[in-house]
Design a protein with these regions (language model features):
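N-terminal leader/targeting segments
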Residues: 1-85, 195, 293, 498-504, ...
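Cap/insert and terminal regions of metallo-dependent hydrolase folds
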Residues: 625, 712-790
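Core dinuclear metal-dependent hydrolase active-site scaffold
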Residues: 326, 330-333, 462-600, 646-730, ...
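Metallo-beta-lactamase
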Residues: 598-609, 631, 731-735
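Aromatic-rich juxtamembrane segments at the membrane interface
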Residues: 167-297, 302-303, 378, 394, ...
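Hydrophobic alpha-helical transmembrane segments in multi-pass membrane proteins
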Residues: 3, 7, 15, 45, ...
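Membrane-interface helix/helix-cap signal primarily in integral membrane proteins
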Residues: 69-241, 583-593, 597, 631-633, ...
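Active-site HxH/HxHxD metal-binding segment of metal-dependent hydrolases
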Residues: 608-646, 752
Length: 811
């Protein structure tokens, strides 16, 4: 059997996925499979085609490896899942002994540490600890505080902090009220961390403040000092991988090690020294997944040399992946794991295909073709750089799109330029680090030279974002689309590989037959896909139900409406002072909902918690129409809005009471407030919020912005002769359920069946008020609130049948 380790990896991944997503027992499934396999070997069934194909496609030794490895990983993941479920309860008070196992991360109001539990039944469990105290790596503490369970995704396909922490093997956070230092554990990792801090201190002394954060990122994988704008530039230019210590860095360390030790100790001893240096480097850089993968693969290559065996790249990749997944099965869902393995597989297996393609580009002119061929032969390293960039990008493309929702076509240029300077940068940087330990003065002089490629790297990241028509925003792909993408990549790879094989194995013959059959039917397959694509477009044009999504944006309001004819309406967008809701929550949410264009954007008023996210959206995607109420007071946000309108050339409609906004047949908004005849000067921005009523057949929803009691009374007074216009099925409770809003008088007039409250979890304003909740409950109005339920999804049929679901299970 070729490459059994790869088969074991496949089985191991199957076991993890099965344990997490399928309720049926994997043991039961394998029993059925083995019975089928046994039947296929009984003579009277041998001629049956169904069982014949089972026997062909599943060899017993392959099946055995998959079963054993998947059962092991399935047991491990189920044990891990059970451990998460039976740990501590949210809010539980703990008194435990712990050890600090990383350096502090400074937050706005506290310091955060990663800790390992040393006492209690949950020994060796990892947690985050928050405290205002300054503590050090290796300190053993006795702490007392409350346990906080990490939050889950609060919106559709939103960021799941709980699942993210699982990839770090962290179970939650303890807010330490009391901290008592007991001892210091001075193990190997303690001294590795001391070395890391010393290197960081030397870098800060020898590099200027502009280049030092990038040097830290490139050489140590420490990106904590890099500002958000620089991160964004590196990401948009498709070169963010240089800030994560990876195989590229490890290869240069191996190169330096070989050159400096081989002449003195010989090849075999130098390999042992290389392994030691790599493990030290791995400890210094903090055991990131990409470094662990690179070091394991390099160690296997060196070990193969020492025992006179040929090293196999696929086996090395598989062994490293199995080790990393054995350490933590949830690493399978880590972006770092996915990037490092997709990129490595792309470079190792797909690069030769890209190189062949570049070398064999068909040019009609014989003269030009000869010149092109000669150029490729003479500049083979240049062709290789292009092939590396393309192959890595092709394999990581679905991950990039899923995480960042953009495609950059400048990646070839930026990665070629980075490929030229990264070698001198890493080698020069490592030499500078070593020399600085001997002489700070000489180290400072070397740093001046290393700063040249660092400055060039920073310049490339900025230029990469400026290329015209190269960066495209894209919606989040579905899982089935990603599977099809990688299946096509695999077919391309296998067809290329199979052409170069003289003698085929049994499995290769089967796969070749399948690929030939697929290729022979390519026209039919293309037609089928075209029909499916056209059908999906037609289906999207068919009128459906009215859908309203009350998005959880923390302490703020945001509502997305999809009309029966699939128009998109966005009402408010939340916003916080210290967190960019638009960038981090609202825009990704729209991409996850397959939205690249908004038909109507309605801003109730220009308080940060209503317009903050909207202002970002207006700059990022196409918005056809913007609707605002008449403004009676200037504000910073309103001035910013006017600048964006001018820059983006947006179509703005200013409305007030009495206006009707027709969206489509049987669906329109009635504007009920503000009224220029009854302008309120007290807290003008809130009390002159745009109040509008969505009408769809027999269903209605009243949007109230942040109006308070004074405005509510004015509205009731204004429509006392036509009070039915205020009656609504759903009330968007004003001002997040504040005690200054939702007076009994307006509740009696609106008579809602449901009340929605957009409010932040554990907010400092005391929203929603107990008085408001009591007033709603007294009238038997069903309450939905984002702090407890997350996103609220409403589906309304033509007959006004309402179906409401929430993201978080509140039972």
């Amino acid at each position: 059997m070729n490459r059994p380790i790869f088969i074991i990896l496949i089985g191991y991944i199957i076991g993890i996925l099965w344990g997490l997503y399928l309720k049926i027992s994997i043991v039961f499934f394998y029993i059925i499979l083995l019975i089928l396999y046994y039947i296929s070997n009984i003579s009277k069934f041998k001629k049956k085609k169904f069982f014949h194909y089972i026997k062909i496609l599943i060899k017993f030794n392959v099946l055995s490896l998959i079963i054993i490895s998947s059962l092991i990983s399935n047991i491990i993941i189920k044990f891990q899942t059970k451990k998460y479920q039976n740990l501590y309860h949210d809010g539980e008070e703990l008194k435990i002994q712990v050890e600090i196992i990383n350096n502090k991360k400074e937050k706005q109001y506290y310091n955060r540490y990663k800790i390992k539990v040393l006492s209690s039944k949950h020994k060796d469990t990892y947690l985050y600890m928050t405290t205002k105290k300054n503590l050090e790596y290796g300190e053993i503490l006795e702490i007392q505080g409350n346990f906080s369970e990490p939050s889950e995704a609060r919106n559709y396909k939103g960021f799941n902090y709980k699942e993210y922490l699982k990839t770090l093997k962290i179970y939650g956070t303890i807010r330490a009220e009391q901290v008592k230092k007991i001892d210091v554990h001075k193990g190997i990792l303690y001294y590795a961390n001391k070395l890391h801090l010393k290197i960081k201190d030397n870098l800060e002394k020898t590099y200027n403040s502009n280049t030092m954060p990038i040097v830290l990122g490139v050489l140590l994988g420490d990106t904590s000092e890099i500002d958000e704008e620089t991160r964004e530039d590196f990401s948009q230019s498709s070169i963010s991988h240089v800030l994560a210590v990876s195989g590229l860095h490890v290869s240069y360390i191996i190169y330096l090690s070989e050159k400096s030790t081989q002449g003195i100790f010989g090849q075999r001893k130098s390999r042992i020294i290389e392994i030691l240096i790599l493990f030290i480097y791995m400890a210094i850089t903090g055991f990131s997944i990409s470094v662990i993968r690179s070091v394991i693969m390099a160690t296997l290559m060196c070990t193969a040399f020492l025992v006179y065996r040929k090293s196999d790249t696929l086996n090395n990749i598989s062994i490293s992946a199995i080790i990393i997944l054995f350490m933590n099965p949830y690493n399978l869902f880590s972006t770092s794991f996915q990037f490092t393995y997709a990129g490595t597989i792309g470079v190792v297996f797909f690069r030769p295909i890209v190189e062949d393609f570049i070398m064999n580009i068909k040019i009609k002119s014989p003269c030009l073709k000869e010149k092109y061929t000669n150029f490729c032969i003479k500049h083979n390293s240049f062709v290789e750089e292009i092939a590396v960039a393309i192959s890595a990008q092709f394999m990581t493309m679905p991950i990039i799109i899923t995480k960042y929702n953009f495609i950059s076509l400048s990646f070839i240029v930026t990665n070629i330029l980075v490929g030229i300077i990264i070698g001198p940068l890493v080698i020069g940087g490592i030499i500078q680090i070593l020399v600085t330990f001997l002489s700070l003065k000489i180290g400072t002089e070397i740093a001046k030279v290393v700063q040249i490629p660092i400055t060039a790297l920073s310049l490339i990241s900025k230029i990469g974002t400026k290329f015209p028509i190269t960066n495209f925003k894209v919606i989040t792909p579905d899982t089935w689309q990603i599977i099809i993408y990688y299946f096509i990549i695999y077919i391309i790879y296998y067809r290329h590989k199979i052409k170069k094989i003289q003698k085929y194995s049994f499995n290769q013959k089967i796969i070749l037959k399948i690929s030939k059959y697929v290729y022979s039917k390519r026209k039919i397959i293309i037609r089928v896909f075209t029909i499916i694509l056209i059908s999906s477009i037609i289906i999207k044009k068919i009128p459906g139900d009215l859908k309203i999504y009350f998005v959880d944006v923390g302490q703020g309001d945001c509502c997305l409406i999809e009309t029966p004819k699939h128009q998109k309406i966005l009402i408010d967008g939340g916003g916080q002072k210290n967190f960019d809701i638009g960038k981090n929550t609202l825009l990704p949410y729209l991409f996850n909902r397959k939205i690249l264009e908004i038909d109507y954007c309605i801003i109730s008023h220009f308080d940060q918690d209503h317009c903050g996210g909207i202002l970002y959206i207006l700059e990022q995607i196409k918005v056809k129409n913007v609707i605002i109420g008449k403004q009676y007071e200037d504000s910073t946000n309103y001035n910013k809005f006017k600048e964006i309108v001018k820059k983006q050339n947006l179509n703005v409609k200013i409305v007030e009471a009495g206006r009707r906004i027709n969206i489509e047949k049987n669906l329109y908004f009635d504007v009920l407030w503000p009224d220029s005849q009854k302008m309120i000067s007290d807290n003008a921005i809130n009390n002159n919020s745009l109040v509008c009523k969505l009408n769809y057949n027999k269903f209605s929803m009243l949007f109230t912005g942040d109006i308070e009691e004074i405005a509510e009374k004015e509205i009731v007074s204004k429509y006392e002769n036509n009070i039915s216009i205020l009656k609504s099925t759903i009330l968007k409770t004003a001002h997040h359920g504040s005690k200054t809003s939702s007076i009994e008088k307006i509740l009696d007039v609106v008579k809602p069946q449901y009340a929605f409250i957009g409010v932040g979890e554990n907010n400092t304003f005391g929203h929603p008020s107990n008085i408001t909740i009591e007033n709603l409950e007294k009238r038997k109005i069903k309450i939905y609130r984002t702090d407890k339920m997350g996103e609220i999804c409403i589906k309304i049929t033509k007959r006004a049948i309402i179906n409401i679901n929430t993201k978080l299970n509140t039972s």
